Amino acid sequence: MKWSAQATLAIVVTLSITATNHAQGKTDVVTLANGDRITGEIVQLERGRLVFKTDDAGTLYLEWDKLSSVVAKRIVEVLTTNGSRYLGSLGRTADRSIVVVTAGDEVPLEMWEVTLITPIGRSFWRQLDGSIDAGFSYTRSSGVAQLNLNSDTVYRKLASRTRLTASLTQTQKDDGSGRDDRASLETSYLRYPWQRWFFLGVGRFESNESLGLELRSQIGSAVGPRLVNSNRAQLMLGAGLAVNDERGVDVEPRQNLEALLMFGTSFYTYDRPTTNLDINLQYYPSLSDAGRQRVQLDAAIKREFWKDLFVALTLYNSYDNRPPNPAADTNDVGVVLSIGWTY
C-alpha cells in the first residue's frame, strides 16, 4: 500500500507538471496592428516571420512588422540586429516594442531590432527546421532525362546552428552514353562566440562526373563577420583553411591544402506569397598546388505557393581549373526547377 500511495502521488505530480507545462506553452500573447490579440505559443521568429501555434486556429505565420506587441512568460533567446543576445521572458511596453525581462534587468527593444526569437528548452525535434525539394526534366530532342533532389536540415541551439545539406543530380541518356551525375553531402557547425563574429566548421563529401571527380572528402573552418542581420536580409563574409582528399577518375589520389574565402547572403519577404533568395559562394585558391583554383556557387530563389509548399529555381556552378583528371571538364553549370516542402 505504501508503494502504491507513493506511485499514485508520483503520477499525480507528473501529470500536474505536464499540465502546467502545457498551459504555460499556450500563454504567449501577440497583438496585431489592428488591436486584435491572439493567445498561443511562440515557436520561432526568423527571417521576419513569427511562427505562432494556437489551439483553435492551428499554426499561424505572422509578419513581424505587422505586429504591435509580443508577450511571453517562458524564457526565450532574443537576437538583435547588432548581434546582442538576451535570455528572458518578454513583457509589453509601448506599441512596436518589447522588453526582455532577464534575471536582474529589463532590456527595452524596438521590434525592428529583433531578428530571432527561440524558446529555450524545446524538444530536439521542435528545434529542427528544413526543406526538401525535387525536380525532373526530360528533353526528347537530346534524349536526356535528369532527376534532382535537395534537402536542408538545421538544428538550432543557443548562439549556434548545426546544418546538414544534401544534393543529388542524376542524368540518364537514351543512347546510354556518358553520365553527368553529381552529388554532395555537407555538415556544418556555426557558432557566434562574439557579438557579430562567427566560427564555422565544415565537413563535405562530393562527387562530380563532369569534373572527373569520384570523391572529394574535405574538412575546413572559417571565421568572419555577419555584416547584415535584419528581418529582410543577411550578409556574411568569412576566411579560413580547408584540407581534402581527392579520388579522380583513372588517376592517383591526391591531397590538397587550400585557403577558403566565403560569401553568403539572403533576402526574404513574407508578404504573401513568401519569397526567399539565398546565394552562397566559396573560393578555394590552392596552397599546395600553386595556381589551382576552385569555385563553388549555389543560388536559389524559393516562392511559396500554398502553405509549406514552394517552387524553387536553383543555379549551381562548380569550377576547377585543374580537375583531378586533366581530360575532364573544368566547369559544371546547371539550372533546376523543382517543387518542395518546408518543415
Predicted regions and their residues:
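Membrane-embedded beta-strand positions in outer-membrane beta-barrel channels/transporters
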Residues: 131-133, 146-150, 182-186, 216, ...
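Detector for outer-membrane/organellar transmembrane beta-barrel domains
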Residues: 232-285
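Transmembrane beta-barrel strands of outer-membrane/channel proteins
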Residues: 132-138, 151, 164-170, 185-189, ...
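Transmembrane beta-strands of outer-membrane beta-barrel pores
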Residues: 136-140, 157, 168-172, 205-209, ...
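Outer-membrane beta-barrel "beta-signal"
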Residues: 331-343
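Compositionally biased alpha-helical segments
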Residues: 23-156, 163-167
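Solvent-exposed loop/turn segments connecting transmembrane beta-strands
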Residues: 137-146, 173-180, 207-215, 249-253, ...
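Repeated loop/turn-to-beta-strand initiation elements of outer-membrane beta-barrel proteins
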Residues: 158-164, 192-199, 230-235, 268-277, ...
